[in-house]
Amino acid sequence: MKQYDLIVIGGGPAGLAAAIAAHKNGVSNLLILERDQELGGILNQCIHNGFGLHTFQEELTGPEYASRFIDEALALEIPYKLSTMVLDISTDASTGLHCVTAMNRTDGLLQLPCRSVILAMGCRERPRGALNIPGFRPAGIYTAGTAQRLVNMEGFLPGKEVVILGSGDIGLIMARRMTLEGAKVKAVAELMPYSGGLQRNIVQCLEDFDIPLLLSHTVIDIQGKDRVTGITLAQVGPDRKPIPGTEQNIPCDTLLLSCGLIPENELSTKLGVSLSPVTGGPLVNESLETNVPGVFACGNVLHVHDLVDYVSEEAGRAGKFAAEYIRQTAGDRAGTASAEQNLTTQADSGASSASAGQGSTPLLRTVPSASRLFHRAASDTRFRSPFGCPIWRTRFWFVSASEAYSQTQY
């Protein structure tokens, strides 16, 4: 089985940007694994505009934004596998290599060894089961992302009378999309006293189409046996519990859920990656590396981003850091082999010297691949107070290890 230097899990905006950056930094032996039938990830179903303002300084749709990175990846001849589901990631403690287990219809079960892995699986929507909404389980309840895919890619309209729970960006955009497709969006309800989406989406998707936004409201009941026939909304207090007497019934045949996104953590958990209780994604250092050496994370699997431009920027950094890690580990292995050979030679020479009565043999402290090691030094500690309170900041610079460590121990 071929051994790769880098495997990128996910062919969405984060995975593509990371793979391109790694390739530009000298990693040509890499592979992208994507579970969907085409590259691009979630952007393929986001046919609205508003993408690329920061990255390309122009307004693009989701597929247009994705095609920019797909075309660049194809031009660089970066290999990829589509319709490939990654099942597991393991690490060999003796060699430090990772093994990615994946499966597809063409190749069957794959065991792919590699030196580094970039996690770019994205995020998923919070389902109904995590919301604890009472009532029956009839047809007509979808997450906003599922409805978006049905409308924009599959050509199906989920319903004609719609209520949306949650005011995340996907929910706001789907309120407009369903209206343009001929459905009647009766209300967008939000549990919090403020909207979870961007202000521009509130204006363009709700106010421009006279769709009411009900803040501090939630769904407390779902009616219907075979199909949704209506829902019951109620106002909530500061404790986020329904206030008795504020219930209102809204007839509808579809309920869309836009109640937040959570990072895809299954593979991270299997690998032993530490997760953040705040973001729900992996804990990483300043190099976007997890607690598992050689495993990096970027994009929405790390934390949910508001703009895809920020995803691409972060993923580019992850690709550069992964490339540096691969070069460093390659140098370390070469240095270790050289050090072992030197020690063997010195041991032989020491034995000869001892027999000749010439004293002890010096022990050399070897720093493998000194040009690839860096020592971080802190200096010029200052603080700023942009919000009225001091925020301590420390500047760092990197010193070449060959300059910082040049010593011999006898």
Which role does the model predict for each range below?
Residues 1-5, 60, 82, 276, ...:
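Rossmann-like nucleotide/phosphate-binding core characteristic of flavoprotein oxidoreductases
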Residues 1-9, 67-161, 235-245, 256, ...:
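FAD-binding core/adjacent interface of flavoenzyme oxidoreductases
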Residues 4-68, 72, 149-152, 159-202, ...:
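Beta1-alpha1 glycine-rich phosphate/pyrophosphate-binding loop at the start
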Residues 56-59, 63, 137, 192, ...:
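Hydrophobic alpha-helical scaffolding
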Residues 73-102, 179-266, 356, 377, ...:
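A Rossmann-like FAD-binding core segment of flavoenzymes
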Residues 109-213, 218-227, 301-306:
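Predominantly flavin-linked oxidoreductase catalytic cores and closely associated redox partners
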Residues 119, 141-151, 254-305, 339:
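FAD-site-proximal beta/loop scaffold in flavoenzymes
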Residues 298-329:
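A conserved FAD-binding loop/helix module that cradles the flavin
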